């Protein structure tokens, strides 16, 4: 019998083992769709970004107008830009849901997979931040100024670090040029780390909603999950295209339609919606270094999650106390997102401080306590 090229060819064999004959648990739910959706988001962003880069000029006097030119004069330039801008939002929606799934079902116990995932999140956040600066509107400029300035809170080397990042004494042409270079480079770095992420995942195989071994009941990825992923893809693309075509500026800031002006500060400087939760945590501490540390901790805390798992059960499927805490955490993050978009005044300040405290309290103290308590409850 002739050998099957899918299983014998050195390259096709790798694809086959990752996407076709991959043994997958028979009971994984739609929450397991988001990995493939993230891959599609990345591919879409790289493609639309490449097309935009062909028409973009990384110069402070031309950047804003090159983006306007793309939207007005390039064939379907408006569409490419809208897909790219809103694609970033959907990328973050998918990654937040993907992380939420990992938290709920204890997927973080695959430590290498989880840690590479956190690195992917950080790289994605860096990519989105430098990308937001490129249109060189008011919010682009002031966002870049405010966020890069946070590094000056680092003792001793802070100011030097900021001026080194800026390439001068303020956000100017060198800053824009290097941000464009970084924004072009980082998505390919993300693609590389994604392969490492998958390599670690395929060492152990996927987790499942019951949190028990699924070795006794595996099914091939294709056609079962390839088809299921295509359904998820269609369900994501419908709202994505609706947003990009009907209200492309819904998630953007009107301030960014004004070209960058270092002499005029916008009344409310705020990042894109997907950074608002971290921005709210940053602002809730009335001290520069303290705020920066809290900001870093808000994301890096994910690296501690595997060590804070005290339950004898892996998933939250049969753990009502942890479930309540999980949904409290979700609600808390929504409150933080809302607070991040509000001005720094009463009552938003105190709400933000309470929500920031709750965020760390739930993750660091209440989750491990609930896990230990549920273990005790199993004995009765």
Curated annotation (Swiss-Prot):
Heme b b562 binds at residues 84, 183. The keyword Lipid metabolism does not apply. Heme 1 (or BL or b562) is low-potential and absorbs at about 562 nm, and heme 2 (or BH or b566) is high-potential and absorbs at about 566 nm. Binds 2 heme b groups non-covalently. The lineage of its organism: Eukaryota, Metazoa, Chordata, Craniata, Vertebrata. GO terms for cellular component: mitochondrial inner membrane; respiratory chain complex III. Belongs to the cytochrome b family. Disulfide bonds: none annotated. It is found in: Mitochondrion inner membrane. This is Cytochrome b. The keyword rRNA-binding does not apply. InterPro entries: Cyt_b/b6_C, Cyt_b/b6_C_sf, Cyt_b/b6_N, Cytb/b6-like_sf, Cytochrome_b, Cytochrome_b_C_euk/bac, Cytochrome_b_N_euk/bac, Di-haem_cyt_TM. It comes from Polyplectron bicalcaratum (Grey peacock-pheasant). A ubiquinone binds at residue 202. It is a multi-pass membrane protein. Heme b b566 binds at residues 98, 197. GO terms for biological process: mitochondrial electron transport, ubiquinol to cytochrome c. Keywords: Electron transport, Heme, Iron, Membrane, Metal-binding, Mitochondrion, Mitochondrion inner membrane, Respiratory chain, Transmembrane, Transmembrane helix, Transport, Ubiquinone. The cytochrome bc1 complex contains 11 subunits: 3 respiratory subunits (MT-CYB, CYC1 and UQCRFS1), 2 core proteins (UQCRC1 and UQCRC2) and 6 low-molecular weight proteins (UQCRH/QCR6, UQCRB/QCR7, UQCRQ/QCR8, UQCR10/QCR9, UQCR11/QCR10 and a cleavage product of UQCRFS1). This cytochrome bc1 complex then forms a dimer. The chain crosses the membrane at residues 34-54, 78-99, 114-134, 179-199, 227-247, 289-309, 321-341, 348-368. PANTHER family: CYTOCHROME B. Component of the ubiquinol-cytochrome c reductase complex (complex III or cytochrome b-c1 complex) that is part of the mitochondrial respiratory chain. The b-c1 complex mediates electron transfer from ubiquinol to cytochrome c. Contributes to the generation of a proton gradient across the mitochondrial membrane that is then used for ATP synthesis. GO terms for molecular function: metal ion binding; ubiquinol-cytochrome-c reductase activity. Its cofactor is heme b.
